[in-house]
Amino acid sequence: MARVTVEDAVEQIGNRFDMILVAARRARQIAVQGKDPMVEEMNDKPTVIALREIELGLVNAHTLDADERQTVREREAAEIAAVAAIAEGRSL
């Protein structure tokens, strides 16, 4: 697929504005946070990869929210373990 049409992604999300927000969040995850793409990269930029994932129904606002909640839970668990280790006087 050489080009991604925004219309295909809009159909998956429901409206153009929500699609833009979801695509931006997912592209940021791929570009900045180091998340792995769910589709083949094919030398595409993160925004195009995000649109392709949306078009295929792999990503939506709910999946991004769930992923973010899981990341927060993991980070909090690591912080709690670090505080417990410090309180017990042992190093990580």
Curated annotation (Swiss-Prot):
Gene Ontology molecular-function annotations: bacterial-type RNA polymerase core enzyme binding; DNA binding; DNA-directed RNA polymerase activity
EC number: 2.7.7.6
Family matches, as Pfam families: RNA_pol_Rpb6 (PF01192)
Subunit note: The RNAP catalytic core consists of 2 alpha, 1 beta, 1 beta' and 1 omega subunit. When a sigma factor is associated with the core the holoenzyme is formed, which can initiate transcription.
InterPro entries according to UniProt: DNA-dir_RNA_pol_omega, Pol_omega/Rpo6/RPB6, RPB6/omega-like_sf
UniProt signal peptide: none
Native source organism of the sequence: Shewanella oneidensis (strain ATCC 700550 / JCM 31522 / CIP 106686 / LMG 19005 / NCIMB 14063 / MR-1)
Protein name (record): DNA-directed RNA polymerase subunit omega
Functional description taken from the UniProt entry: Promotes RNA polymerase assembly. Latches the N- and C-terminal regions of the beta' subunit thereby facilitating its interaction with the beta and alpha subunits.
SMART domains: RNA_pol_Rpb6 (SM01409)
Any one Gene Ontology BP term: DNA-templated transcription initiation
NCBIfam families: rpoZ (TIGR00690)
Gene: rpoZ
Gene3D superfamilies: 3.90.940.10
